């Protein structure tokens, strides 16, 4: 028997996803308006953490830079898949958090890729020479961490919240 789709099935998933998308898009709007032109950097802790406005045509942390037009379609496929999954399958709270964060990141960066052909990155950890990233990337990584944590609990004792 097919499971019916319901937005009410996993409320935390939807709340996290919507909040994450809004925060990501507002942060990128702020960066694009306050830090113009591209390349502007503001040291918050000089040599350690800066806001640096860059345009990324690649994936997270600038992987596949310049040749990744397919990423917008991947973002769309992941987003549609997660929406269908969360609308049909009851999930534990930690799973809702994880999948909601991943959806927020996929949609946040997907919006940028479809509208502009690039993603705005601005979080710049210079102390460890880490690639510049954005809140959507953070959201995806939080989601992965939450799902990994949830995987430590056996499915047989799984209690849906």
From Swiss-Prot:
Its main location: membrane. InterPro entries: Peptidase_A8. GO terms for biological process: proteolysis. It is found in: Cell inner membrane. The chain crosses the membrane at residues 11-31, 44-64, 66-86, 100-120, 135-155. Signal peptide: none annotated. Pathway: Protein modification; lipoprotein biosynthesis (signal peptide cleavage). It comes from the Bacteria. The active site is at residues 121, 137. One of its GO terms (molecular function) is endopeptidase activity. GO terms for cellular component: plasma membrane. PROSITE patterns: SPASE_II. It is a multi-pass membrane protein. NCBIfam families: lspA. This is Lipoprotein signal peptidase. It comes from Synechocystis sp. (strain ATCC 27184 / PCC 6803 / Kazusa).
